[in-house]
Curated annotation (Swiss-Prot):
Superkingdom per UniProt: Archaea
Keyword annotations: Ribonucleoprotein, Ribosomal protein, RNA-binding, rRNA-binding
Protein name per the record: Large ribosomal subunit protein eL20
GO biological process, alphabetically ordered: translation
GO molecular function, one term: large ribosomal subunit rRNA binding
InterPro entries referenced in this protein's UniProt entry, alphabetically: Ribosomal_eL20 (IPR028877), Ribosomal_eL20_dom (IPR023573)
Binding partners and assembly: Part of the 50S ribosomal subunit. Binds 23S rRNA.
Amino acid sequence: MEVKVYRVKGIFQRGKLKQPFTKEYRALKPEHVEELVYSEIGSKHRVPRTKIWIESIEEIKPEEAENPVVRRLSLEL
């Protein structure tokens, strides 16, 4: 199995405010990325999973990653 880089776009609602987000993760499957998003945003912003809407999960090349940590980890291997 190969670890891939994914970019996730979506929206979460905190109170009356809807906040867009874009995150990048390294994972084996898109399902793992989905779980990471729910876990990280829910924990950091105290938002329940029902208030987090994932619009897209796309696989990207490691060179396209904007997050320097994700890019560096992906390119070193």
